[in-house]
Amino acid sequence: MKFFGVPALMLAGACSTNSGSLAPSPQSHVAAPRAVSHDRRWGPNVSAACPDRRPDEAQCFLLIRTGPQLVPDGGSGPNGGFTPAQLQKAYNLPSATRGSGQIIAIVDAYDNPRLADDLAYYRSYFGMPAANFTKYNQLGQLGAYPVGNEQWGAEEDLDVQMASASCQNCSIVLIEANSPSAKDLGNAVKAAAALGAHIISNSYGCYTACGLKEKYFEARGVTYLAASGDDGYGTGVGTPGAFAAVVDVGGTTLVAGVKGKRGFEESAWPGTNSGCSHKSKPSWQHDPGCAFRTANDIAAIADPNTGPAFYDTYGFSGWLVGGGTSASTPLIAGAFGLAGNASSQNGGRTFWEKAHEGPNDLYRITRGKNGTCKPAYLCQEGTQEYRDYGGPAGWGTPNGIGAF
């Protein structure tokens, strides 16, 4: 089988878990058009999972490596992808001992009827316990799921697996919107909060006025996270990431096999969005080069060339290597789950106010850029134009859970 130009991959085993979902009929399954790489920042062997969106819809940000691994120091998992153990080590996450009782909600569009089985296989393959996982429709109900869509289905697989990778003991709920429209996604976000999730991860967005409403991202006691996007500097800062109550998550290139205590190094990933948004400047941001909401707040692995391994049997044939800020966002959501303080946090404000309290709680990113800009700190790391801040990676990447 081939899809999006990705060769069929030999499966390492078979799933036997009951998904607990209502599989759509063949008539309700949507295989959207083939997506192709259109951004040189991604590299020659990377494709976008979701096609370009309609003006009134959000777009998922999953990127998939479609060719051989070009970077020798990637992960040790299938196809050279990073494993959960490597990600936990890279970010110093106490994943085995914390997170019980925490709920991470993932919001996406459309259905993936294979998702529970894919998640079960991913966790079993990497030696994690069975997941506490539940899938809901956009009204927060079991059953009556939307039509299936292979592209968004792959996004859903990556999201729940990355949340598992960083917080294996967290409960994970997936809320499937009927479509990527602003209204449907907003209702799904609202349902996630009503279900009791204090952490809501959103790996989608739009750079123009698609109609996403800020009111859906303002529930008390909820930490919202959003992917910043994968088009580099200059395409804008989209929503929902630009909303003041949302943690805007950027991306890095993570490399393994480095000498030193950590064993990894990171630089800004050229594909991550960052910069000066069109939303009002929050009172807790004081950087001098942007009169509006500045992005990003924090970051994690996003470069699909050295991305995490994930598993999809709905539109693909098993193991893939993915990336984009779709990978970093649920991974950071898991870090909030490990810390257990999400109900008392306040979006991106957390990192802007705490960035100087515990300098060892975040790995400062000092290299890399995602474009050319003035002032340079909005698109480049290590400038020291505004303290340790750089737009692509925000205040840094997790070093444990002290910053959360």
Regions found by a protein language model. Give the residues of each.
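Polar, glycine-rich mid-to-C-terminal structural blocks
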Residues: D248-C276
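Sec-dependent signal peptide recognition
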Residues: M1-A8
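An often Trp-containing, charged/polar helix-loop segment at the C-terminal end
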Residues: N18-S21, A333, G340-G391, N399
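Short, surface-exposed amphipathic charged segments that create phosphate/polyanion-binding patches used
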Residues: G148-G153, V189-K190, K261-S267, Q380, ...
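A residue-level detector for conformationally permissive "hinge/kink" positions
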Residues: G5, G221, F316, S326, ...
